[in-house]
Every structure is written in C-alpha cells, then in structure tokens.
Amino acid sequence: MINAINLPISLNNGPPAGGFGLNTNIFEINIINLGIVIGLLVYLGEGVLTNLLVNRKQTILSTIRDAEERYREATDKLKQARARLQQAKVKAGEIRSNGLARMEREKQDLINAADEDSKRLEESKNSTIRFEEQRAIEQVRQQVSRLALERVLESLKSRFNSELHSRMIDYHIDLIKSMEGTTD
C-alpha cells in the first residue's frame, strides 16, 4: 500500500550519504522543504527587503517633496506673473488714457493755433485794407490838391497881369527893407 500513496520523497534519489540537499523539482517538493525555503527567504531577505522598501519610501517622499516645492514655486511664479500682468494692464491703461489726453491737448492746441492764425490773417487783411484805403484817400487828396492848385494857378494866370505883378514886387521890396531896418 505504500506504493499507492506516492509520496514525493524518494529514498533512492536522495543525496549521497553524509550530506544534506534540497529537492529542486517543484512537483516533488514537500511542505517541509517549502517551509525551509520560505523561512530562509524571510530571514535572509528581510533586511534587504526592508532596505529596499525604506529606500523606495525615501525616494517617493523626496519626489513628493520636490513636486510640492516645484508646485509652490510655480504657484508663486504664477502669482508674480499675474501681479505683473495686472501692473502691465494698469500701465497700459495709463498710457492709453495719457495718449488720449495728449491727443486731445494737441488737437485743442492745433485748433487754437488755427484760430490764432485765422485771427492774424484777418487782422492782416483788415490792416492791408485800411492801409490801401488810406493810400487811396491820400492819392485822392493829392490829386484834388493838385487839381485845385492847377485851377488856382490858371485863375491866377488869368487874373495876374503886369500891374498886379508890379505891385506885388513893390510890396515885397518894401517888406524886405523894413526887415533890414529892424535888424540893424
């Protein structure tokens, strides 16, 4: 009946006398061999496995800390960028409003300059018109005076005869003599 149970331990296939060995055939392993192997793995591998797990844990924690630090830095940079953007918007608004105000001032200055130029041109035109009027009036006066003198001369020529001429000469001679007598 022993043959019917088929135990995985074979007496013929064992190690030579005086030695210890493990059966590496997985289908022929018994529970004791399996317990010994697992016990050795746990005993010998515990320190290595613990070190691996501790190192892995430290690496993960370091990576998490680095990620959190980068997140904080990115958040700070984002806040700074938003603040700079806001400042840029404010500055752009100031520049835009200053530009509009300057444009309005320059527009008003141009309008005022055009008005002043227009007034100066009007005054110059009026001055030129007055000057031309005065010149025309002066020319008319001169022509009237010349014509009046010409008429007077013509009337004097027609009335002036030799007797009147002699009396005028005598009158002026007497006038000169009386002036000489008063100066001596």
Curated annotation (Swiss-Prot):
This is ATP synthase subunit b, chloroplastic. It comes from Psilotum nudum. In plastids the F-type ATPase is also known as CF(1)CF(0). Belongs to the ATPase B chain family. F(1)F(0) ATP synthase produces ATP from ADP in the presence of a proton or sodium gradient. F-type ATPases consist of two structural domains, F(1) containing the extramembraneous catalytic core and F(0) containing the membrane proton channel, linked together by a central stalk and a peripheral stalk. During catalysis, ATP synthesis in the catalytic domain of F(1) is coupled via a rotary mechanism of the central stalk subunits to proton translocation. The chain crosses the membrane at residues 29-49. Pfam families: ATP-synt_B (PF00430). It is a single-pass membrane protein. The lineage of its organism: Eukaryota, Viridiplantae, Streptophyta, Embryophyta, Tracheophyta. The gene is atpF. It is found in: Plastid, Chloroplast thylakoid membrane. The keyword Thylakoid applies. Keywords: ATP synthesis, CF(0), Chloroplast, Hydrogen ion transport, Ion transport, Membrane, Plastid, Thylakoid, Transmembrane, Transmembrane helix, Transport. One of its GO terms (molecular function) is proton-transporting ATP synthase activity, rotational mechanism. F-type ATPases have 2 components, F(1) - the catalytic core - and F(0) - the membrane proton channel. F(1) has five subunits: alpha(3), beta(3), gamma(1), delta(1), epsilon(1). F(0) has four main subunits: a(1), b(1), b'(1) and c(10-14). The alpha and beta chains form an alternating ring which encloses part of the gamma chain. F(1) is attached to F(0) by a central stalk formed by the gamma and epsilon chains, while a peripheral stalk is formed by the delta, b and b' chains. InterPro entries: ATP_synth_b/b'su_bac/chlpt. One of its GO terms (cellular component) is chloroplast thylakoid membrane.
